[in-house]
C-alpha cells in the first residue's frame, strides 16, 4: 500500500487538475452558448438559399455553369474541419477517422484542412494538402468562410480536383454531435430542397426572369451558396467542439472527484493503520518495562 505522503501528494495533484478541468468546463459552456446562437441564426438562411438555388437551377436548366457541371472524377478533394486544440473528447478523432477510412490507400485525393488537428494528422500520413487554415479562433466570421470557399472553387475550376466533399461535425446538443459528409462541388442539382419537390408542391410555380442573364445570376448566386455552406459547416463544427469539450471536461471533473474520494479513503485507512501500529508499539513497550 502506498505511504501517506505519496497519497497526499496524489490528492493534491488531482485536486489541482480538477480545478483546471472545472474551469475549462465553465469556459466551454459560455462559448457554447454563443456558438449555438450563431448556428441557430445561420441555419434558416442556409436552408432558404438551398431552396432558391434549386428553383433557379431548374428554371435555367439549359445553362452550363462550371460549378454545376459534372465531369469524370479523377481526383477528389476533401474539406476537413477539425479543431486546433484537443481536450474535447472524440470530436477530432471522429472526423479524422471518417475521412481516413475513405482515403486510406488512395492517391487520388487532395485535402483542404481547417484546424491544426486535421492538418497535423494528414501531414504525418503523407497526404496531399492543397491548403490549410489554422488559428481561426473562437469568433468565426463570414470572411473566413469566403477565403476557404475561394480556394476550394479555384481548385475545382482549375481542374486540380473533380469533386469536393465537405466533412464536418453537425451540432445537435452539448451531448450529441455527428460527423457528416456532403458533396460541395459540383453543386448537386437538387441541393437542399429539390427541384422536383418544388414542382410537386401545390399552387402555381413562379416564372423566373433573369436579369441581365441566367449566367450572370448564377455567377453571383452559386459562389454565395458554396460560401454559405462552408460558413454553416464552420459554425456547426465550432458549436460541436465546445459542446464536446464541455462534456469531456465535466466527465474529467467528476472522475477527479471520484479518485479524490477513493484516495482520501485510502489515506484514512493508512493513517488508522499507522496509529494502531504506534499504539501497539507503546503498549508493547509498556508491557516490556512492566
Swiss-Prot record:
Question: Which PANTHER family does the UniProt record give?
Answer: ATP SYNTHASE GAMMA CHAIN (PTHR11693), ATP SYNTHASE SUBUNIT GAMMA, MITOCHONDRIAL (PTHR11693:SF22)
Classification via SUPFAM superfamilies = ATP synthase (F1-ATPase), gamma subunit (SSF52943)
Q: Which InterPro entries match?
A: ATP_synth_F1_ATPase_gsu, ATP_synth_F1_gsu, ATP_synth_F1_gsu_CS
Identify the species of origin. Heliobacterium modesticaldum (strain ATCC 51547 / Ice1)
Give UniProt keywords alphabetically: ATP synthesis, Cell membrane, CF(1), Hydrogen ion transport, Ion transport, Membrane, Transport
Stored PROSITE patterns:
ATPASE_GAMMA
- Per UniProt, what is the membrane topology? Peripheral membrane protein
Which Gene3D superfamilies does this one have? 3.40.1380.10, ATP synthase, gamma subunit, helix hairpin domain
State the organism's lineage: Bacteria, Bacillati, Bacillota, Clostridia, Eubacteriales
Query: Its function?
Result: Produces ATP from ADP in the presence of a proton gradient across the membrane. The gamma chain is believed to be important in regulating ATPase activity and the flow of protons through the CF(0) complex.
Primary localisation category: membrane
The protein depicted here goes by the name ATP synthase gamma chain
The entry sums up its family as follows:
Belongs to the ATPase gamma chain family.
Q: What biological processes does GO assign it?
A: proton motive force-driven plasma membrane ATP synthesis
- One term of GO molecular function: ATP binding
Per UniProt, subcellular location reads as:
Cell membrane
Q: How does it assemble?
A: F-type ATPases have 2 components, CF(1) - the catalytic core - and CF(0) - the membrane proton channel. CF(1) has five subunits: alpha(3), beta(3), gamma(1), delta(1), epsilon(1). CF(0) has three main subunits: a, b and c.
Domain of life assignment: Bacteria
Q: Name one GO cellular component term.
A: plasma membrane
